């Protein structure tokens, strides 16, 4: 009987260690306590409270398993331990949770089977009686520690306290000494706020580039907790930071002082479906020439908000032009101030004097935003790249359609089986996307006047190439990153794991293309990276794999001329610092901002 009890206790402790990486268990306990505290006392958003509770489930199960092991080792029958077994199986059976495991799922399954067998034998050999062992001290310590962390975190506006930062490298490299590149000549859309501060891709050409100085390593890192992913960050004419942050169920607008991260005002402005890969409802928004926020709310309504108090000042209902169950993905104005919008099921519309008019692109899904030039709009669907134009007060007219290789499947890291890029315009002739070809993705460059494909350049390792983010256009260079492996979203980068490495560049000059460089070590799970002509840097956000299980995220600079990594600086550790498809941004003062699952992180100059 003694051997049976010791075997059961050992197996229960083994389950506690194997079902979630021990380092991740600690990280999630601190993250969960922090998010719960901020949800209760700071942002006061119900589903943020739910997120905090979610992070705490597996740490709580681990504590209960150890508590059960102590009981089984003494005199308990093991019924409570048996009840815990379905929770232990969760990480092995649920794909979203598998990356949290310390071992392969089959190993945990075998341990659970053995544990259940021992517990059943123990229950059968132990008579029913009132147990007199005292093991509740462990649960009491857990509860006291959790309560203390909840209260302490609830009193601050920063990300949750995370003690594992000390086990991550601080960074590498130093400030660059390279010369500046020629300043960008990107057209200013007169209906939008000033470039490059008006949208997720900086301008209506979606160049993702700046002519601003970037911070150097060694600067201070600040954070602001919002409880949601702040995918798009803009700056108005007063220099204030304007953003929409999406929790699982809500979209909350923020007006923030970028120098202090003090929240000037905030307000819930919409709702969204609980999805990790659906960006409709507020993932994309644009700041117009009057400093107003324009975004597609759920239900097919284009909402216009004042950036003074985040109250609605105008709206356009375009739901009648959408297919059943279709949501608007993104909205941008053209040079005449007309709102263009795209829907997830292939609708492209424009709001003219007679209201919204639209056409449907054969039901082809549209998962990303679009680009707007003076004389046309460029949209990529799941099957083709389009140029469209407005015709009077009628629906948009298709100017040309260029099919691309959409591949055979949705690759890990993508939100759909198709191109993951918003079209990028450059120079006075080009438009670029990536395809989804198997086994190797290509950068596809077309003549934006005719749609003729000028070149297709394969990038990254065969069988491990995909991107879900727009190309960067800077000087004569197009920069692309590899996001292959960011699946399941969020948990794929837990427990020291990360995605496939890769960043590459091609030159595109006078209608001809050639590979420029390829970096096979930088790891960018999902950031919308940016570049600046000042010292010629790509500014990105990396998460290299680690052997100790600490999930460290880094602000990173890469030389746009050579592809060499110039410097990195630790942003922080844990899931709060996961940007999850959000972008990087430079402020007018040279601060580097990144939207994350918990809010905003910034590297100061």
Language-model segment annotations:
Residues 2-266, 290, 605:
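Sequence/structural signature of beta-propeller modules
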Residues 245, 430-433, 469-575:
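Loop/turn-rich, solvent-exposed surfaces of beta-rich toroidal or solenoidal domains
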Residues 268-282, 296-338, 342-372, 405-414:
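Asp-box/WD-like beta-propeller blade repeats and closely related beta-sheet repeat scaffolds
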Residues 236-246, 291-297, 303, 337-342, ...:
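Short beta-strand elements that form the blades of beta-propeller/WD-repeat-like
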Residues 248-257, 299-306, 345-352, 383-389, ...:
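Structural motif
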Residues 578-605:
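Blade-level signature of beta-propeller repeat domains, shared across WD40, Kelch, NHL, RCC1
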Residues 267-277, 317-324, 397-416, 456-464, ...:
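Surface-exposed loop and turn segments in beta-propeller and other repeat-based domains
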Residues 226-235, 271-287, 321-336, 363-374, ...:
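Repeated scaffold domains used in trafficking and secretory/extracellular systems
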């Amino acid at each position: 009987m003694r051997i049976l009890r010791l075997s059961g206790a050992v197996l229960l402790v083994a389950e506690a260690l194997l079902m979630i990486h021990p380092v991740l268990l600690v990280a999630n306990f601190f993250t969960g306590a922090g998010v719960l505290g901020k949800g209760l006392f700071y942002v006061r958003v119900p589903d943020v409270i739910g997120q905090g509770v979610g992070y705490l489930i597996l740490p709580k199960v681990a504590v209960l398993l150890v508590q059960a092991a102590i009981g089984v080792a003494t005199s308990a029958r093991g019924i409570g331990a048996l009840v815990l077994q379905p929770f232990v199986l969760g990480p092995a059976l649920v794909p979203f949770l598998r990356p949290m495991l310390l071992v392969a799922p089959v190993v945990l399954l075998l341990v659970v089977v053995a544990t259940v067998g021992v517990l059943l034998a123990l229950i059968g050999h132990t008579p029913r009686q009132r147990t007199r062992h005292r093991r509740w001290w462990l649960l009491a310590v857990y509860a006291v520690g959790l309560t203390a962390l909840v209260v302490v975190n609830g009193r601050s506006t920063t990300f949750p306290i995370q003690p594992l930062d000390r086990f991550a490298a601080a960074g590498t490299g130093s400030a660059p000494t390279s010369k500046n590149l020629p300043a960008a000549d990107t057209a200013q859309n007169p209906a939008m706020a000033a470039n490059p501060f008006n949208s997720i891709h900086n301008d209506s050409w979606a160049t993702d580039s700046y002519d601003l100085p970037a911070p150097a390593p060694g600067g201070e890192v600040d954070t602001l907790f919002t409880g949601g992913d702040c995918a798009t960050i803009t700056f108005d004419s007063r220099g204030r930071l304007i953003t929409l942050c999406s929790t699982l169920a809500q979209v909350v607008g923020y007006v923030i002082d970028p120098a202090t991260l003090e929240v000037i005002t905030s307000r819930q402005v919409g709702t969204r479906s609980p999805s990790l890969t659906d960006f409709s409802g507020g993932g994309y928004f644009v700041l117009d020439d009057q400093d107003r926020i324009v975004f597609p709310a759920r239900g097919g309504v284009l909402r216009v908000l004042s950036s003074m108090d985040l109250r609605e000042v105008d709206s356009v209902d375009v739901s009648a032009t959408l297919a059943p169950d279709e949501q608007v993905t993104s909205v941008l104005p053209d040079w005449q101030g007309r709102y263009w919008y795209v829907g997830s099921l292939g609708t492209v519309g424009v709001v003219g004097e007679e209201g919204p008019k639209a056409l449907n692109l054969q039901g082809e899904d549209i998962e990303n935003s679009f680009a707007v030039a003076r004389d046309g709009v460029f949209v990529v669907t799941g099957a083709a790249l389009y140029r469209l134009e407005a015709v009077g007060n009628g629906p948009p007219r298709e100017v040309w359609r260029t099919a691309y290789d959409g591949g055979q499947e949705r690759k890990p890291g993508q939100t759909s089986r198709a191109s993951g890029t918003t079209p990028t315009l450059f120079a006075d002739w080009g438009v670029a996307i990536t395809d989804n070809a198997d086994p190797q993705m290509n950068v596809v460059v077309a003549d934006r006047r005719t749609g003729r494909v000028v070149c297709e350049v394969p990038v990254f390792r065969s069988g491990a190439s995909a991107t879900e983010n727009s190309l960067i256009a800077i000087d004569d260079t197009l920069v692309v990153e590899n996001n292959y492996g960011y699946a399941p979203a969020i948990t794929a980068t837990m427990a020291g794991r990360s995605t496939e490495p890769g960043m590459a560049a091609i030159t595109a000059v006078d209608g001809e293309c050639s590979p420029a460089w390829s970096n096979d070590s930088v790891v960018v799970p999902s950031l919308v990276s940016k570049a600046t002509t000042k010292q010629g840097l790509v500014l990105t956000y990396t998460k290299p794999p680690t052997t100790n299980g600490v999930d460290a995220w880094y602000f990173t600079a890469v030389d746009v001329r050579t592809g060499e990594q110039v410097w990195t600086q630790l942003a922080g550790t844990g899931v709060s610092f996961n940007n999850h498809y959000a972008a990087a941004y430079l402020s007018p003062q040279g601060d580097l901002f990144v939207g994350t699952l918990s809010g905003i992180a910034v590297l100061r100059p």
